[in-house]
UniProtKB/Swiss-Prot annotation:
Record-linked Pfam families: HABP4_PAI-RBP1, IHABP4_N
Amino acid composition bias (Acidic residues), ranges on this chain: 199-213, 338-347
Protein's name in the database: Intracellular hyaluronan-binding protein 4
Stated role: Ribosome-binding protein that promotes ribosome hibernation, a process during which ribosomes are stabilized in an inactive state and preserved from proteasomal degradation. Acts via its association with eef2/eEF2 factor at the A-site of the ribosome, promoting ribosome stabilization in an inactive state compatible with storage. Plays a key role in ribosome hibernation in the mature egg by promoting ribosome stabilization. Ribosomes, which are produced in large quantities during oogenesis, are stored and translationally repressed in the egg and early embryo.
Biased amino acid composition, Basic and acidic residues: 61-71, 83-107, 116-125, 146-174
Molecular function in Gene Ontology: ribosome binding; RNA binding; translation elongation factor binding
Taxonomic superkingdom: Eukaryota
Quaternary structure, from the entry: Associates with ribosomes; promoting ribosome stabilization. Interacts with eef2/eEF2; promoting ribosome stabilization.
Similarity field: Belongs to the SERBP1-HABP4 family.
Location within or outside the cell: Nucleus; Cytoplasm; Cytoplasm, Stress granule; Nucleus, Nucleolus
UniProt keyword annotation of Cytoplasm present: yes
Keywords from the named record: Cytoplasm, Nucleus, Translation regulation
Cellular component GO terms, alphabetical: Cajal body; cytoplasm; cytoplasmic stress granule; nuclear speck; nucleolus; nucleus
Length: 347
């Protein structure tokens, strides 16, 4: 038997609302009233905070007053402290004092001392421990006897050429280069020597500048009067022409004497020769000119007329079409322009 399956119908749930915008009417108060209420709340909070601040200030004042109650007798011990009067403590100025101060004249000269290895060996070792390696690893010896102690400057085992040339490396205290500190007096002497030379050069430059200014300035007695020049255009052009350099042309002078080979020619003979030259005009033609042998005919050109098309065989009749014979066309000869009979209107 087939199982019966019950189909549940789709059920929808909903609620009906009379006015969906009815909830917006709950806040009908004026916005200005809300702002005024917020301002009053802030003022009340400030009033509550003010007494708290005053109480904290009074507590701090009380602490200071308790400290001030302590009285200290003066160092002499002879004075008496009156009741009701407080003794004010003077601040003690603690100054850091160094060794004795020297004036410029009493200053000792600065010197740099270099200890020799003898002093280093005789002097006891500084610090907590003694020399290196005196414990279980065996006795230790200083690495180099030519320099300072082990905690001072580092000394290398080998110097360039010092072992071979038997020249010990000494500290440089003059000149230039690395490890050259010099002395303070050397630096001061260089500044003192350089400053007067600079002052002398500046004085010389100022004197030279004053001299040049005096030469360039015009004398006060001479009065310079500047007047603007006014002129017309023609005058300006004349000045320009005067200042313009003149161009020299190499012109040959005419000779006044008559040459011996000169011949007088009469004008009438020249006119007769010119008339004869105009009449006797000859056109030269090359030997290979063919234009004289050509015939020119004016009229209709020989154009073949369109004839009828030959018949074509229909479908199934594939026979070749026979060519049609055309009768020769006769054309009239062109009129001769020299013959007056061809052109009777011109006669």
């Amino acid at each position: 038997m087939k199982e019966l399956v019950e189909e549940m119908p789709d059920e929808g749930y909903g609620c009906t609302v009379a006015n969906r915008f009815g909830q917006l009417l709950g806040d009908e108060s004026d916005p200005f009233d809300i702002l005024y209420a917020a301002g009053t709340e802030k003022k009340q909070k400030k009033k509550k905070e003010e007494p708290k601040k005053t109480s904290t200030t009074t507590k701090s004042v009380k602490k200071e007053s308790q400290r001030d109650r302590k009285t200290i007798l003066p160092a002499g011990g002879g004075g008496q402290v009156r009741p009701g009067h407080e003794v004010v403590e003077e601040p003690i100025q603690r100054r850091v004092t160094f060794d004795r101060k020297f004036n410029d004249a009493e200053k000792p000269p600065l010197s740099f001392s270099v200890e020799r290895p003898v002093d280093v060996l005789d002097r006891p070792a500084r610090g907590r421990g003694t020399g290196r390696g005196k414990g279980a690893r065996g006795p230790g010896f200083p690495r180099s006897n030519d320099g300072f102690d082990q905690r001072g400057k580092r000394e290398f085992e080998r110097h360039s050429g010092s072992d071979r040339s038997s020249v010990r490396s000494e500290e440089k205290r003059s000149g230039s280069g690395s490890r050259n500190w010099g002395s303070v007096r050397d630096h001061m002497s260089v500044i003192e020597v350089a400053s007067p030379s600079e002052e002398v050069t500046e004085n010389e430059e100022t004197q030279e500048a004053v001299e040049t200014d005096g030469e360039n300035r015009p004398s006060e007695t001479e009065e310079v009067i500047e007047v603007a020049m006014e002129m017309t255009l023609d005058e300006w052009k004349a000045l320009q022409e005067q200042s313009r350099p003149k161009v020299e042309l190499n012109i040959r002078k005419t000779e006044s004497s008559v040459p011996s080979k000169a011949v007088v020619i009469h004008k009438s003979k020249l006119l007769q020769k010119q008339d004869g030259m105009d009449e006797d005009v000859v056109f030269r033609r090359p030997a290979n000119d063919i234009t004289c042998q050509l015939e020119f005919n004016f009229g209709s050109l020989d154009r073949p007329t369109r004839g009828g098309r030959g018949g074509r065989g229909g479908r199934g009749r594939g026979g070749p079409s026979m060519p049609t014979l055309r009768s020769p066309q006769k054309f009239d000869s062109a009129p001769n322009p020299d013959d007056p009979e061809d052109f009777p209107a011109l006669a």
